[in-house]
């Protein structure tokens, strides 16, 4: 009788453990579904390829994906237009840990015919920052674009590579004046999003 009772106890215990596992699995699935739902909402306006990469990273199918550039930078409101203009399409570039991670993501996009995306591996991207000393005394100079936003230190190389050689001016007149003084060597963006390009063209 004791053996039979012990057997029943073990069966009940096993059934309880199985139920706990099933509950945990169900909770995990709900958690992942919620994460993907939030991700979808947060990626409104992004290209299909970028959304696909972020979804697969959320599912654990891609590793080393840090996120789109725009999600990794913190920009004060007063500089938002200027920095968005300076970044342009690069806002949707995807930062990854390594070249291997980039290759896997590119392969996935190609296999599923989901378009293209640009990947920025932390292991290879390095940036240089303009020397602002010559410009600091010029009327209308605001700063170097890379210094007007914040990010985790691990992304500073990415930030500097995209924004380190862009100056920000108060308005288009100031931008043109500074560009002339600096011999049109680099881009200058005004706070309202006008651009004096390297070489002298205006956008």
Can you say where each PLM-predicted feature lies in the sequence?
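Hinge-like oligomerization/junction regions that interrupt long coiled-coil arms in large cytoskeletal
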Residues: 28-203
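Extended, EK/Q-rich alpha-helical coiled-coil segments that serve as long dimerization/scaffolding arms
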Residues: 1-44
């Amino acid at each position: 009788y004791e053996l039979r009772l012990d057997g029943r106890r073990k069966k009940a215990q096993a059934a309880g453990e199985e139920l706990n596992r099933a509950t945990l699995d169900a909770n995990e699935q709900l958690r992942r579904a919620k994460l993907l739902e939030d991700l979808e909402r947060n990626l409104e306006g992004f290209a299909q390829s970028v959304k696909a990469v972020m979804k697969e990273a959320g599912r654990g199918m891609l590793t080393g994906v840090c996120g789109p550039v725009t999600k990794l930078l913190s920009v004060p409101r007063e500089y938002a237009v200027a920095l968005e203009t300076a970044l342009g399409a690069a806002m949707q570039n995807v930062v990854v840990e390594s070249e291997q991670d980039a290759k896997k993501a590119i392969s996935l996009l190609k296999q599923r015919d989901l378009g293209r995306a640009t990947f920025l591996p932390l292991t290879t991207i390095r940036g240089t920052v303009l020397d602002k000393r010559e410009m600091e005394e010029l009327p209308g100079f605001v700063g170097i674009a890379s210094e007007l936003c914040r990010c985790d230190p691990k992304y500073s190389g990415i930030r500097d590579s995209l924004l380190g050689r862009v100056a920000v001016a108060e308005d288009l007149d100031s931008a043109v004046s500074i560009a002339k003084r600096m011999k049109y060597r680099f881009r200058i963006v005004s706070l309202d999003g006008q651009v004096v390009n390297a070489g002298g063209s205006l956008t």
